[in-house]
C-alpha cells in the first residue's frame, strides 16, 4: 500500500454521471464501492465533495446573484452530495462514515473539528467533508487542499472525468499530450487549470502532491492507492 492517508476530491459533476443535473444513484453506488475497497485495504480516506451537479455559485453570481449568497447555496449543495455518498457507503457497503460540515447543522452532520476528524480516520472511518471551507469566495478545490493539510494527508486524489492533465483540451485537440508528471510551478505558469491557483499554492507550500485521474476507469481509486501509474502526478 503506497498511501496511508488520502484526501479524495470528488467533483459534483462526477456524481451526476451522464445526466445534465442532479445525482445518478448508480454512479454514487459505484464510487462508494471503490471507496469501500480502498478502506478495507487499510488506507485512511477523507473525501471533499463538490456541488456543481446541483448549483454553481460562480455561474449564479455572473447572472446577478450576490456572490457570497451564491457560494453559500453551493455549500449547501455539497452537503446534499455528502449525505448521498454517506448513505451509499453505510447502507450498501457497511462502511463506517462521519460527515463533518464547515457550517453548523447538527441534525445532519458533526461540526468540523480537526482533531475529531483525525481520530475518526485513525478508527478506520471514512470522513466526508461538507459545506466547503464554510467561507464564500473559496472553491471546493481550495477546501480539498486546506483539509488535506489539516489532516496530514499524504496526497490529494483529484477524481475527474479525464485521465490526467493535458497540454491542451483533448476534446478540441486530438494531438493533445498528457503529462505523466508535472510540477506545481509548471501548472501555474502554463495555466493548466488542474485546480484554482489558491489550491495549487496551498499544496505547494505544504508539499502535498496531487494525482489527477479518471474516476470512471474501473478500480482507478484502488490502483492509485496502490501506487500504480494512473493519471498525472503533480508535485
From Swiss-Prot:
Protein residues bound to ATP: 9-12, 52, 56, 160, 166, 169
Keywords: ATP-binding, Cytoplasm, Kinase, Nucleotide-binding, Pyrimidine biosynthesis, Transferase
Catalytic activity: UMP + ATP = UDP + ADP
BP GO annotations: 'de novo' CTP biosynthetic process; UDP biosynthetic process
Enzyme class per UniProt: transferase
Principal subcellular localization: cytoplasm
Annotated GO MF terms: ATP binding; UMP kinase activity
SUPFAM superfamilies linked to this entry: Carbamate kinase-like
Subcellular location: Cytoplasm
Function summary: Catalyzes the reversible phosphorylation of UMP to UDP.
Family designation: Belongs to the UMP kinase family.
Name of the protein this chain belongs to: Uridylate kinase
Amino acid at each position: 500500500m503506497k498511501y496511508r492517508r488520502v484526501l479524495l476530491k470528488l467533483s459534483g459533476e462526477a456524481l451526476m454521471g451522464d445526466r445534465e443535473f442532479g445525482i445518478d444513484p448508480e454512479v454514487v453506488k459505484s464510487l462508494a464501492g471503490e471507496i469501500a475497497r480502498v478502506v478495507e485495504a487499510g488506507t485512511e480516506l477523507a473525501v471533499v465533495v463538490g456541488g456543481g451537479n446541483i448549483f454553481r455559485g460562480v455561474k449564479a453570481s455572473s447572472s446577478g446573484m450576490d456572490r457570497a449568497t451564491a457560494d453559500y447555496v453551493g455549500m449547501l449543495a455539497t452537503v446534499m452530495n455528502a449525505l448521498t455518498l454517506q448513505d451509499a457507503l453505510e447502507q450498501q457497503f457497511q462502511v463506517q462514515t462521519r460527515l463533518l460540515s464547515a457550517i453548523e447543522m447538527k441534525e445532519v452532520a458533526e461540526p468540523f473539528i480537526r482533531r475529531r476528524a483525525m481520530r475518526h480516520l485513525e478508527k478506520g472511518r471514512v470522513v466526508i467533508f461538507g459545506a466547503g471551507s464554510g467561507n464564500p469566495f473559496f472553491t471546493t478545490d481550495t477546501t480539498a487542499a486546506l483539509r488535506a493539510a489539516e489532516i496530514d494527508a499524504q496526497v490529494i486524489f483529484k477524481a475527474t472525468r479525464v485521465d490526467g492533465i493535458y497540454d491542451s483540451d483533448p476534446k478540441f485537440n486530438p494531438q493533445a499530450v498528457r503529462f505523466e508528471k508535472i510540477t506545481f510551478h509548471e501548472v501555474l505558469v502554463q495555466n493548466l487549470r488542474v485546480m484554482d491557483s489558491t489550491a495549487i499554492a496551498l499544496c505547494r507550500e505544504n508539499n502535498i502532491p496531487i494525482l489527477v485521474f479518471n474516476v470512471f476507469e474501473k478500480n482507478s481509486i484502488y490502483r492509485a492507492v496502490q501506487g500504480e501509474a494512473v493519471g498525472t502526478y503533480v508535485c
